[in-house]
Amino acid sequence: MGAFLDKPKMEKHNAQGQGNGLRYGLSSMQGWRVEMEDAHTAVIGLPSGLETWSFFAVYDGHAGSQVAKYCCEHLLDHITNNQDFKGSAGAPSVENVKNGIRTGFLEIDEHMRVMSEKKHGADRSGSTAVGVLISPQHTYFINCGDSRGLLCRNRKVYFFTQDHKPSNPLEKERIQNAGGSVMIQRVNGSLAVSRALGDFDYKCVHGKGPTEQLVSPEPEVHDIERSEEDDQFIILACDGIWDVMGNEELCDFVRSRLEVTDDLEKVCNEVVDTCLYKGSRDNMSVILICFPNAPKVSPEAVKKEEELDKYLESRVEEIIKKQGEGVPDLVHVMRTLASENIPSLPPGGELASKRNVIEAVYNRLNPYKNDDTDSTSTDDMW
């Protein structure tokens, strides 16, 4: 869904912060899409006696950004203020939290539906949501749709959320029970996710409850006991990231970046740029949350990174000089490098993660460069 631009919008929105023993950074980019429909939430220290708790989420909107924007501002309140979450006096139990998260999703969805019906023109937008609620003892992963979150523990992917796709047997069964069908892996041949907030055109089957509709607003919630020694970082991202990078790939790439910089915004920017250069055509948003035992900057890794950048710079110069008259285009340079066995490329990111370094050298050495052109405008990145 959605139209594409002639060239991607690469300006990024960034934020970072720390508290409760956590550090986070985030980056979002419109990319090739005509509109930016992603939104995000990052809150360290919750109100009402939950100062040691934190909440992070990414919302991937479709058919508009209204639902994503509303959820990023109000979902947390719907979760923490309902009676299921509060439970009895004192800190909420694990079951209180899980029930409260579910209730919060159903409540905000119903609230948005009522607001939409009161308007003359009903809002047809929807949004996925993936998030984490982090208490001193537990991490609660929350997922509704096909955005994804993962936990890297002891240098490996320890947990990741499951995408809610119409082709999933349990999702397909619910869709068919509601009178719908799954065609070309979409709900009624149209919507690519089987759970989402909003999308009220898919939630009007009479005699069915809110979690029995063609599209369900019910999140999956998983609680994981925190491990101070082994927990390293959490990644939350929309499908514009996961379309081109697998779980292990992204975990490896982020870990390698944390060994060369402690700037979490920069790490997230590298993730977004790398995914663009790997061919992602969607909006892209990523939040990186680091625990105290996250990888630290390594002098050895920094030295290897510097050596790699110098090697790439020299190879670009050699490729341009070898051309003789004129200058080869950047696509030719990238394809030449891609055909070579280059040591020490960042795992998961590979050559795409070094595109900015290569392009900077190319532009410096290219006397014919037109500043109005954008090498990313080609469909075939290399």
Curated annotation (Swiss-Prot):
EC number: 3.1.3.16
GO molecular function: magnesium ion binding; manganese ion binding; phosphoprotein phosphatase activity; protein serine/threonine phosphatase activity; R-SMAD binding
Cofactor binding, note field: Binds 2 magnesium or manganese ions per subunit.
Subcellular location: Nucleus; Cytoplasm, Cytosol; Membrane
Modified residues (Phosphoserine): 375, 377
Cofactor: Mg(2+); Mn(2+)
CDD domains assigned to the protein according to its UniProt record, in alphabetical order: PP2Cc
Topological category with respect to the lipid bilayer: Lipid-anchor
Example GO biological process: positive regulation of canonical NF-kappaB signal transduction
Binding site residues for Mn(2+) 2: 60, 239, 282
Lipidated sites in chain (N-myristoyl glycine): 2
Annotated disulfide bonds: none
One GO cellular component term: membrane
Catalytic activity, reaction form: O-phospho-L-seryl-[protein] + H2O = L-seryl-[protein] + phosphate; O-phospho-L-threonyl-[protein] + H2O = L-threonyl-[protein] + phosphate
Annotated family: Belongs to the PP2C family.
Record text on subunit structure and interactions: Monomer. Interacts with SMAD2; the interaction dephosphorylates SMAD2 in its C-terminal SXS motif resulting in disruption of the SMAD2/SMAD4 complex, SMAD2 nuclear export and termination of the TGF-beta-mediated signaling. Interacts with SMAD2; the interaction dephosphorylates SMAD2 in its C-terminal SXS motif resulting in disruption of the SMAD2/SMAD4 complex, SMAD2 nuclear export and termination of the TGF-beta-mediated signaling. Interacts with the phosphorylated form of IKBKB/IKKB.
UniProt name for this protein: Protein phosphatase 1A
Organism listed in the record: Bos taurus (Bovine)
Gene giving rise to this polypeptide: PPM1A
